[in-house]
Amino acid sequence: MAHKKAGGSSRNGRDSAGRRLGVKRFGGEQVLSGNIIIRQRGTKYHPGANVGLGKDHTIFATADGTVKFHTGLKGRTFVSIVPGADEAVPAVAAE
């Protein structure tokens, strides 16, 4: 009597899609209020001035300005927004 053994089943072959975490706006970049600066799990980066922290630890701008990364107490990295004179379109000299 001919028999064929049943094939084994693989336990691998699954993976989840990446979560698209990380820094979205780097130091020195201009941002508008509401722009997302960092998506993270936990507080690897902490909120500084003119920055908010979402319930999923997303850091976002609360004011227009320039992104600045700096180190604070206990070696924590903070992200702040430095409001500055926005680079407006230069006026054309009158002839």
Swiss-Prot record:
Domain of life: Bacteria
Gene3D superfamilies: 2.40.50.100
Pfam families, per the entry: Ribosomal_L27
InterPro entries assigned: Ribosomal_bL27, Ribosomal_bL27_CS
One Gene Ontology MF term: structural constituent of ribosome
GO cellular component: cytosolic large ribosomal subunit
Region called Disordered, residue ranges: 1-22
Entry keyword Zinc: no
Keywords: Ribonucleoprotein, Ribosomal protein
GO biological process, one term: translation
Keyword presence, Membrane: no
Record family assignment: Belongs to the bacterial ribosomal protein bL27 family.
PANTHER family for the chain: LARGE RIBOSOMAL SUBUNIT PROTEIN BL27M (PTHR15893:SF0), RIBOSOMAL PROTEIN L27 (PTHR15893)
Record's protein name: Large ribosomal subunit protein bL27
Gene: rpmA
